[in-house]
């Protein structure tokens, strides 16, 4: 359902060629971090291009609850008057993070070494997700956490009064875990060290450095060793948020799979730790080009152009690529359904603990649309049916997951018959303009009466 309402059933109808320019919203990962680091800096941080989806708005409200002044001046233009490292005030009420796993986990890290108590909750999807992967390393600083059985929300954290730095090896590749530990390390004396065997998105490291933290990243036999020196005074910044590569995946996808389409998606952040999908699509033979390559705010940026691709071939996606495209496997599985041959996605068990069990959700939905799918705990295999080969005609469960809902709506635009989702409401968490943006390209999306 929508963040605070009834389900919004939606249907995507087979559409003619899609064309035009798709201005997708600002990057969700960078938007969350801009607000949180701005709240931990001393002075005014200015942000333009902020994603104003429900997830990020929930983080903005949380920063206000912890004592920062967060102001929207115009669409996408915000300022944050920070309280300094260790300056968070104790919230008077429960912190509701809605659907956002990123938001709740980063905020837990940011408050973990300040001697205050806060209670966190979220929607039904977020309350089902495990938080032990965050609270376990935070306990090393001296933070205590009490939640529901299985380490689930609602959960109350009490920050460490006398935090000690930690040395932590991330057991499963996760930028959220890494970032939570680094944010906690900001208010711990000495050096906090995070070791990750596989590189994950590095926005936190880049942005911490930009805000004035002393942070280094070194390669070692065990992986990336990230060292943060605690208790800096973070300097406020002026941030221009690049457009979200995860959101861009949806207009790119329909450009590739709807016959005759030609879609331009400008200003997309192409951080190497986020660009795995686009590398994969090129390997499949997609008509995908990168134009006007440039750097903005320390992040590589380009305009993406996606044209209908009738010669895409299924491939084996290297499992080591998973951290750089973990959010894009749902839409990749749809694109794979319109390729020829098998697309094998291994090393994706992390998908089972996202907003939904995304492996199961995509497998069941694609099967309902007439696509042959195989899965095990760590693998998803899609047997492509070629251009225009997906029968469609199904209603797919979104499981309160924005990416599942958008993926199946994209599927329906290229299928032989319409594809519906039981609830398009969660799309607002990350991509509130998805529906008008797709419609402007020529897509036919309808909201169905319940």
UniProtKB/Swiss-Prot annotation:
3-phosphoshikimate binds at residues 28-29, 33, 174, 176, 327, 354. One of its GO terms (biological process) is amino acid biosynthetic process. The active site is at residue 327. Pathway: Metabolic intermediate biosynthesis; chorismate biosynthesis; chorismate from D-erythrose 4-phosphate and phosphoenolpyruvate: step 6/7. GO terms for cellular component: cytoplasm. Signal peptide: none annotated. GO terms for molecular function: 3-phosphoshikimate 1-carboxyvinyltransferase activity. SUPFAM superfamilies: EPT/RTPC-like. Residues 1-26 are annotated as: Disordered. Pfam families: EPSP_synthase. Its EC number is 2.5.1.19. CDD domains: EPSP_synthase. Monomer. Belongs to the EPSP synthase family. Catalyzes the transfer of the enolpyruvyl moiety of phosphoenolpyruvate (PEP) to the 5-hydroxyl of shikimate-3-phosphate (S3P) to produce enolpyruvyl shikimate-3-phosphate and inorganic phosphate. This is 3-phosphoshikimate 1-carboxyvinyltransferase.
């Amino acid at each position: 359902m929508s963040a605070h309402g009834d389900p919004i059933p939606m249907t995507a109808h087979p559409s003619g060629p899609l064309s035009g320019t798709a201005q997708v919203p600002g990057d969700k990962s960078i938007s969350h971090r801009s607000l949180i680091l701005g709240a931990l800096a001393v002075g005014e941080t200015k942000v333009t291009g902020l994603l104003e989806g429900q997830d990020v708005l929930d983080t903005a409200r949380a920063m206000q609850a912890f004592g920062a002044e967060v102001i929207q001046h115009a669409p996408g233009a915000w300022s944050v008057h920070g309280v300094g490292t260790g300056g968070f005030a104790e919230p008077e009420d429960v912190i509701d993070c809605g659907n956002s796993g990123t938001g709740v986990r980063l905020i837990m890290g940011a408050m973990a070494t300040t001697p205050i108590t806060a209670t966190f909750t979220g929607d039904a999807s977020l309350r089902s997700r495990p938080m032990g992967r965050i609270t376990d390393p935070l306990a090393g600083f001296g933070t205590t956490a009490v939640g529901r059985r299985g380490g689930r929300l609602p959960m109350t954290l009490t920050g460490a009064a006398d935090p000690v730095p930690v040395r932590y090896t991330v057991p499963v590749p996760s930028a959220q875990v890494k970032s939570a530990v680094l944010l906690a390390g900001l208010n711990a004396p000495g050096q906090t060290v995070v070791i990750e065997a596989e590189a994950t998105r590095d926005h936190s490291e880049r942005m911490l450095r930009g805000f004035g933290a002393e942070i280094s990243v070194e390669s070692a036999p065990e992986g990336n060793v990230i060292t943060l020196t605690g208790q800096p005074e973070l300097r406020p910044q002026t941030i221009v948020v690049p457009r979200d590569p995860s959101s861009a995946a949806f207009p790119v996808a329909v450009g590739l799979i709807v016959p005759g389409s030609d879609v331009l998606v400008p200003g997309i952040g192409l951080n190497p730790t986020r660009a795995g999908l686009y590398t994969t699509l090129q390997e499949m033979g997609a008509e995908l080009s990168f134009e006007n390559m440039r750097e903005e705010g320390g992040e590589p940026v380009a305009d993406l152009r996606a044209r209908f691709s009738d010669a895409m071939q299924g491939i084996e996606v290297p499992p080591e690529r998973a951290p750089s495209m973990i959010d894009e496997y749902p839409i990749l599985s749809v694109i794979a359904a319109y390729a020829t041959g098998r697309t094998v996605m291994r090393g994706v068990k992390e998908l089972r603990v996202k907003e939904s069990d995304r492996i199961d959700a995509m497998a069941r939905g694609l099967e309902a649309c007439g696509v042959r799918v195989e899965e095990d705990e760590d693998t998803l295999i899609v047997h492509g049916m070629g251009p225009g080969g997906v029968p469609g005609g199904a209603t797919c469960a979104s499981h309160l997951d924005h990416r599942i809902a958008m993926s199946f709506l994209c599927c329906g635009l290229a299928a032989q018959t319409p594809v519906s989702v039981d609830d398009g409401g969660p799309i607002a968490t990350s991509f509130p303009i998805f529906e008008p943006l797709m419609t402007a390209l020529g897509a036919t999306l309808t909201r169905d009466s319940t």
